[in-house]
Amino acid sequence: MCMPMFGYGVYQTAPEETERCVSEALGIGYRLIDTAQVYGNEAGVGSAVNKSGIDRSDIFIASKIWVSNMNYERATASIDESLNALNVDYIDLMLLHQAMGDYPGAYRAMEDAYKEGKIHAIGVSNFYPERLIDVCALAEVPPAVNQVETHPFHQQHAAPDVMNKLGVAHEAWAPFAEGLNGIFANLILAEIGAKYGKTVGQVILRALLQQDVIVIPKTTHRERMRENIDVFDFTLTDEDMAVFATLDDPAFKPIFDHLDVDTVSGLLNVFVGKQLNGEKLY
């Protein structure tokens, strides 16, 4: 799999805004576009891609199977639905969005879609190390990517060790921590950036890239798109990277804590309960 290290994410981008945003991102030079079934904006992504005039083989589209489709039959159907929504012949990378429900069954559906040429690579998202080991042990086609929350305050120092051993690429969601903890005003990051004439956001993205982490920052503003991708003309020193590492905060509560019972059960009730004759799972 040849996947760009830098991409554009459309999480929480309104469907009516998605085509414009993706078109602008493609025009600026982005070639990896990350969407998901639950985002409700696959159609906008596909429309922008198909109208771009860029050869389809030069654009890398990633989407994700949502928890309500986590068994073989529903996952199989949902892959076809995503292909139709995107209006493309294949999806470059399909991920399981969460390690919930019958994800082994959904994974088998992705493997079959891979063999049929509907998807060109398989991955997972939000799989903690023990779940990643589990799915790799069961997989006929190993996952290429694990997309997990990764940012200065939650740097995932342990997870990459497992990913590296399994040959799974590390992709970050929420590289800017969704703006929490005053991240864009962080004095440590600002001081690093000042040495290179770069912003806090650019320092974050550059640091992650230097750790071989794929990044997919989201913005709906053209100038911020340009700013985000302008990170290939400088390199952080070992000292900079050591300072960046000190920002990792064990006390930081993950944006979405997959080990929190109330969080997980609430998500399943909201997004899956309606799919199961209205009966709540918890």
Regions found by a protein language model. Give the residues of each.
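N-terminal binding-site loop/beta-alpha segment at the start of enzyme catalytic domains
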Residues: 1-59, 176, 272, 277-282
